[in-house]
Regions:
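A short, hydrophobic C-terminal helix/tail in secreted or cell-surface proteins
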Residues: 178-198
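Bacterial N-terminal signal peptides
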Residues: 9-16
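Helix-boundary and membrane-interface capping/anchor signal
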Residues: 25-176
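Sec/Tat signal peptide C-region and signal peptidase I cleavage site
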Residues: 19-24
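Short, charged juxtamembrane terminal tails flanking transmembrane helices
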Residues: 200-203
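Bacterial N-terminal signal peptides that target proteins for export
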Residues: 1-8
Length: 203
């Protein structure tokens, strides 16, 4: 019984940590590649934060310093679902709205674009929510899927160097989707807890 007194708090701590991770499920992507490096530079051009809470995914695009999201296809994602609803749009520039599916020049077609009317008042932050209408996303890393050209996210960007030049950027390129290290961290904590439990049981 004395040994159980020590083991119980460890197991509770592991369970609580897992619960907290489930509550704060997110993944980040980087817009690393442009369709016109000679005009836009080499990047990175911005980040995309995907947060999944209670089945609702909040997608936040943040432009890197020196860039803004502009015009049609200001931002785009490839949603991992056959049906979904989009809403709760925010922009710190011109207002944005859903513009359905379409091409982001050089990076193929994305099934969900969010657009502005023009490039007169670009935004450094654009956010919106997605709700799956055809199933359940198991994690934030499961919300998006690679398009046929092997890109997850893209954006129409304008470089802030006085030229007004625009182009497109996307990322990540093909391969697997990162899970933010959550799986590895939880595995490490669990193994550590088991090791401590074994020590107490043997003593």
């Amino acid at each position: 019984m004395k040994k159980l007194k020590y083991i119980a708090p460890i197991l509770i701590a592991v369970a609580c940590l897992g619960f907290q991770q489930a509550k704060a499920d997110f993944v980040d992507y980087t817009l690393t590649t442009s369709n016109s490096p000679g005009t836009l530079g080499t990047g990175p051009f911005g980040t995309v934060h995907v947060d999944l809470t209670a089945g609702v995914a909040t997608i936040t695009f943040t432009a890197a310093s020196g860039y803004l999201f502009v015009d049609g296809g200001a931002v785009a994602v490839n949603v991992n679902a056959s049906a979904w609803t989009i809403g709760n749009f925010t922009s710190n520039g011109e207002s944005v709205s859903s513009s359905g599916a379409g091409n982001e020049d050089g990076f193929g077609s994305f099934n969900q674009k969010v657009s502005m009317q023009d490039s007169s008042n670009g935004a450094s932050i654009i956010s919106f929510t997605l709700t799956n209408g055809s199933g359940t996303w198991l994690s934030a890393a499961n919300v998006l899927a690679f398009n046929e050209s092997n890109w997850l996210v893209a954006a129409h960007i304008q470089i802030q160097d006085g030229t007004g030049n625009t182009g497109y950027a996307a990322g990540p390129a093909g391969g697997s989707v990162p899970d933010g290290g959550t799986t590895v961290m939880l595995l490490g904590v669990a193994l550590g807890a088991l090791g401590m439990a074994r020590r107490f049981l043997r003593s």
